[in-house]
Amino acid sequence: MMGAMSKNMESMPDMAMMDMSVLQACMDACAACEQACTVCSTQMMDCAPACMNCADMCHTMMRSMLRMQGMTPASMMAMLDACIAMCQMCMDECMEHADMSEVCRLCAQACQACTDACTAVKDMMMASA
């Protein structure tokens, strides 16, 4: 089932070549990662800075995907790379505490899912270029 965001995005002329399900999955993963990182940042002081930065990056990535008109492929790739890097850093930090904290384990899982979703969008963009 296509969400309202996907329907709106599909109506944009620049989006005709994009697979809306891949974009929707990435936005969903970014939102889930943002939430998991926000929760983790309030629970574990050791990884709080990484979690807060990752939450901000995921939020920014999701918002950028909602307004892709005017965004060049190069800038979109740079945003995806930045989101992947932030998620990887946060995941690595949270994995150090994952055996002691369920919150950190769940945050690391959300970071991995977001990394995978951003990579899928990059792959789709490269295939359609």
PLM features per residue range, with description:
Residues 1-129:
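Amphipathic alpha-helical hairpins
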